[in-house]
Amino acid sequence: MTCTSAFIKVVRFIQVVIDTREIRSLCTIRMQVESLQNLQAKIRNDERNHSLTKKYLTDDIVKKYQATKTSLGGTLAQCVNTNAYNPGALLPRSCDLNAYETFRDFFDAVIADYHKVPDGKIQHPKSNFGDLKSLSFTDLNTYGNLVVSTRVRLGRTVEGFGFGPTLTKETRIELENKISTALHNLSGEYEGTYYPLTGMSEEDRIKLVNDHFLFRNDDNVLRDAGGYIDWPTGRGIFINKQKNFLVWINEEDHIRVISMQKGGDLIAVYKRLADAIQELSKSLKFAFNDRLGFITFCPSNLGTTLRASVHAKIPMLASLPNFKEICEKHGIQPRGTHGEHTESVGGIYDLSNKRRLGLTELDAVTEMHSGVRALLELEVMLQEYNKGAPEGVMPVEPLTYLAKLLEGASIEKCYTRKYLTPEIIKKYDGKRTTHGATLAHMIRNGAYNNRSICPRTGEAECYSTFIDYLDPLICDYHGVKDSAFKHPAPTFGDLSKLPFGDLDPTGKFIVSTRVRVGRSVEDFLFPTIMSKTDRIKLEQVISGALKGLTGEHAGTYYPLTDMKEEDRKQLVEDHFLFKNDDPVLRDAGGYRDWPVGRGIFHNNSKTFLVWVCEEDHMRIISMQQGGNLAAVYKRLIEGINAIGKSMKFAHSDKYGYITCCPSNLGTSMRASVLLKIPKLSSQPKKLDEICAKYMLQARGLYGEHTESPDGTYDISNKRRLGLTELQAAHEMAEGVAKMIEIEKGL
């Protein structure tokens, strides 16, 4: 006896009429999941998980909703289950159409964040596809013939039915029948055939696969959200005769209505979709909410649910390190060739509008057209500007294009912009070094990060090829007054008779001391433009030398590629692991091929550390707790000398040691202490005066561009060029001693 028939007998017995929707609710065999508390713990404890679910699934939310159910029996645990098992999944999924209101405090926070809702006030206008007779979009293949196909789709939920976690097999079939009947009634260009997945013939299956129409059950995120329960029952595909109109039934949403065709004629595709959905609305009632718009399984699709997209050939644009950020700037979301969570094939990407909530359908498709047009125009520029570039070198936007973006930077604070004059642009536009580095490569990080101070070079040759740009910049940054400057020869001093010792014998002010230098290996390009092959070769050269160190410097090398989880956790705990999260270095090309060719070496006592292929080929670091600068400095110099026996460092009589960033030229040394100066730091003007007088640089506790609320600052020497290593360390020591003296007196 079925659940429904048993219930109806009870109904007849007590002579009560119950709505069929209530029967569905009471008889649902729901997706079984762990408790909300357990799922929250899994999400919270997974450091790979950076989802909005993790952000907003607070203890208060769990407490409030742990026993709450929707009218269809759905739970918040069902909504967040997929995030517990897929750390890369950004969003929860709604268990049914009522979940957004039942769990409103949770979902509203997620929705407002994802859709960038101003002031968190969620609202959505009435549906408006515009006047379909007067659309004015240009064909997107006008811009370089790069568009392979155009596609516009939207999702719809039929009122009265749950989503995957709360649908029974019987109601899923009922829903399928309801939708397929409406589709069979379509006429004209929409007339077609419905193919249920259950019992599908092999001939039909092969045909649908060949046409790329068949959806599958291989998405882990959708699976763990309950999207594949009872697969393939209740699911199917409708296709019109021209194969340019398609409807998926019970894939993620109840229906996905899709209009598509080859080429870039967005008007034809959009009009076909709009006419069809208006026709289907006559026989199907779609769930709509005045705040959220049309209701969908995933919060990302709320609102219009409309996703207008093209498959476009953009290999150069897609290879840029900040490709996703460029797309986001233009309101576009990039995906792989075969959809979300897939890779691109042959440089072809799916580009679609990102915004769906808070605007009309016409607004959404207009934004998509404008954004895609801008990206296609940029791809055309990239292809033209990078003709003849050496293989493996990162493509780069035209110098004039980046110079325009750089205008947003402060001409007083940004050296990159200050010296990029019209004359310099004219002189160096299109010029390359022997291995393909351009001035455009160098200024790119500043163009996209206007707070960045200095350019990044691609190889040592940049300093001679672009000398008229770099030399004035270098003189200004390093305070060098003579344009014919020459850096002194390396001088580390007598390590047994150093002019400084422990800067804080009492231990009251200095938390730790650290001295580092950058080194480039001769005949290798810098990490910003280096090829993957050379990156691996360089890592082998450096790691081989490090593994040969002895005595106090002997230790272990940890390559970032295929790093063991236990090693990764230990390096994180020790604060040794460098990451790929600096947008300035990213946009200079510093994270290309990540994590290939990179690694970390540290000695057994964890006081000597080498970063391989972060910004420079090597960052060699000596450090320890307390203020004993002499011990830290001595360890560093002895380590540098030992490594230098196995390779030749890039060095110039003019610039000293050659580094990726001009700020590190010369000694490339940064000697620093973590200094507790709460009284002095509460007087920013006085702190700045001391730093200026003693040529020091003060950074926040977490590095450059950060604050220090507790008064602990990273204090380091500012000068690196025009003085010896010994002088640089001594300069820092004298300045720190003065700061401690002032702090004591306040």
From Swiss-Prot:
Residues at the catalytic site: C298, C661
Keyword Signal in annotation: no
Record keywords, A-Z: ATP-binding, Flavoprotein, Kinase, Magnesium, Metal-binding, Nucleotide-binding, Oxidoreductase, Repeat, Transferase
Catalysis performed (reactions): taurocyamine + ATP = N-phosphotaurocyamine + ADP + H(+)
Listed GO MF terms: ATP binding; creatine kinase activity; metal ion binding; oxidoreductase activity; taurocyamine kinase activity
Keyword Metal-binding set for record: yes
Approximate repeat residue numbers: 31-393, 394-705
InterPro entries to which the protein is assigned, alphabetical: ATP-guanido_PTrfase (IPR000749), ATP-guanido_PTrfase_AS (IPR022415), ATP-guanido_PTrfase_cat (IPR022414), ATP-guanido_PTrfase_N (IPR022413), ATP-guanido_PTrfase_N_sf (IPR036802), Gln_synth/guanido_kin_cat_dom (IPR014746)
Similarity remark: Belongs to the ATP:guanido phosphotransferase family.
Full protein name: Taurocyamine kinase
Species name: Schistosoma mansoni (Blood fluke)
